[in-house]
Amino acid sequence: SDHRRQRQMCIRDSISTVTGLGWRKAGDPVYLLGVPTADGESSTLGLAGSAYQQLAIGRLAGRPPETDFNLEARVGGLVRDAIARGLLASAHDCSDGGLSVALAESSMASDYGISADLAAGGVRMDRLLFGEGGCRVVVSVKSECVQAWAALVDAVEELPITPIGVVIDQPSLIIKVDQTPCLDLTLQQCRDAHAMALPRRIEADAEVAK
């Protein structure tokens, strides 16, 4: 059977309902949907097969995270509903690089930064920052829509929704872990590192091929 993923085209009635990955306004609260940051046990989240593992050890190994199709559907349903109601300023999945990379990418795609404080709950730092899977989506909610967002969330049963930070009016990626400083980078530093990702990968592959 053919297990290849099929790309789907989504047709919108109005461009006003299109939600990008970049932050839109300082002061907008940021939430993590899906497996919470402090969950160190979920088999749907891990480092096996991740971008971090490839960079750290130069290869992919181990059993990749499992897929919770029920949670995926519920997270996706909430995101679509919130977008349709005009509540979200941005939405970005954490499937490639993990939570910290998603926060960096949403910042680089805008003129704003993020100040985040992640609850670790004993979770290993690499899993916390770079774990992939977990049906995770990072969203920023329009500050004027916080009450409507809260009402929508209250109607959703047993869906993990974790407040993790706020959009800031400065070009910085600021991440604390349990209120302790962890990362403090300018967006230019993030962009420089991002621009070098492909050359580094090509160089690494060339070394392996020798």
Residue spans of the language-model regions?
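Short beta-strand segments
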Residues: 8, 32-34, 140
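Glycine-/charge-enriched secondary-structure boundary and capping motifs
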Residues: 5, 61-64, 71-76, 83-210
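Short, Lys/Arg- and Gly-enriched loop/turn segments at beta-strand edges
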Residues: 14, 37-53
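Single conserved hydrophobic/aromatic residue that forms the stacking wall/gate
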Residues: 1-7, 11
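Gly-rich Lys/Arg/Thr-decorated short loops/hinges at beta-loop-alpha junctions or inter-strand turns
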Residues: 48-66
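Short loop segments at secondary-structure junctions
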Residues: 12-13, 35-37, 142-144
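Acidic/histidine-enriched ion/cofactor-binding microenvironments in catalytic or ligand-binding pockets
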Residues: 14-35
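Glycine-rich, flexible loop/turn motifs
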Residues: 14-19, 48, 125-126, 160
